[in-house]
Amino acid sequence: MYNPTCEMAVQNNSVSYQPPLRLQEFERAMSSLMMFISQEGDCVVGEAPDDELLLFWKERGVYLPQFVSKNDAISLIKDGAILIPWGGSRQLYYSYGLKQKSEQYTDLMRCFFSRELSVVLEDTVCRLCQGRNNLKQYDIEEKSELVTERDIMERRVRKGSCVVKSLWSSSGRGVQLVREQCHIEPAIVWARGKIRHDGGVVCEPFYKRLGEFTTLIEIYEDGRIEYLGTNYFEADEAGRFGKELIGQNILTREEEQEVAQILIEAMSRLNWVEKYIGKIGVDGMVYNDKQGERKVRICTEVNMRHTMGNINLSVVRCFSPKVKATWQIEQFDNAMSWARFCKEMDSRFPLVLDDKNRIECGFFRLSSLGYNYGAWGIVQG
């Protein structure tokens, strides 16, 4: 099931938490994305997408799961089905009748959704890379740090050129950029509130990004840690998600493998296999350091859940090799605006398929009509 508000539920830590209505609408609108990562026999919690969308992706080789209501899902769980959410929370498990699992969602699991985890992982990664000539492109100048004292935070912010992040929230939310003098005082006031409420903030240097990527990993019950692939995406300076990228890799295959192996070794050292089972997405970035040398920062954010990268790794198989494409999620004025937009884009950028029925050019959509949120993309000509 698609529940990207899981981080809010984890922060709230109450079994009665309910996300804002607009985000509930967003979750319903985007539930169709789960079909891209479903397997035979799976059911997706949510309304079935429109027939046109289902047929389009079925012809591209996507498995079409059965879409079920929440009540039907609860019945299936009682009969032995396993609930696999986008991300876990006490509230989610409780609402689906899994009270024991909700009670087992301890403070330790809650810590896995804190940005402090990213600081710990990056520190371990840097220790692994330090002094090793073959890994010097991953040996970064400054690391992110957890700051719990107001005076230390203020000194860091007044130095400028930094990013201040709240401990809770992700995907570019809860972030203050400090690039100019006018940013300093508002950031300090904001960070004081976060330290008072959450106990700390994360401070990290600001780098002009050349590109961003997510290393996708899964930890299994038997203790295996598996590298699933590397995804590329576009975000703004604060790290807010913009677009998923297809055919626009910024790392070499060798670098992708190196980054994955470093992360797996770091997770093993931190003993995550005894504490967590499931998907992990570790965001990273490529930038030029002060000397103009290309650097790869392996860990800027850790997502202990599914990510859009998991979906994109599946979506990319539906495209002709070597094409360059992007897709994104957009909010429209209403459902009619989303439907009208699709009709106009279909006319302006007609779909072209290759001899294997894969997308070669044109406009495509990934989510259902009938909502004021839509996921859509285009293959660059």
PLM regions and their residue ranges:
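N-terminal-proximal low-complexity accessory segments that begin disordered
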Residues: 2-35, 40-42
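Conserved N-proximal alpha/beta basic substrate-recognition cap immediately N-terminal to
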Residues: 23-33, 45-149
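ATP-grasp fold ATP-binding core
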Residues: 156-177, 196-209, 301
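Glycine-rich phosphate-binding loop of ATP-grasp-fold ATP-dependent ligases
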Residues: 162-187, 213-214, 236-251
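Phosphate-binding site of ATP-dependent enzymes
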Residues: 187-237, 285-299
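ATP-dependent carboxylate/phosphate-activation module, predominantly the ATP-grasp catalytic core
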Residues: 217-268, 303-330
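A long amphipathic alpha-helix within ATP-dependent nucleotide-binding catalytic cores
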Residues: 240-294, 330-357
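Peripheral (often C-terminal) accessory segments that flank ATP-dependent C-N-forming ligase machineries
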Residues: 321-381
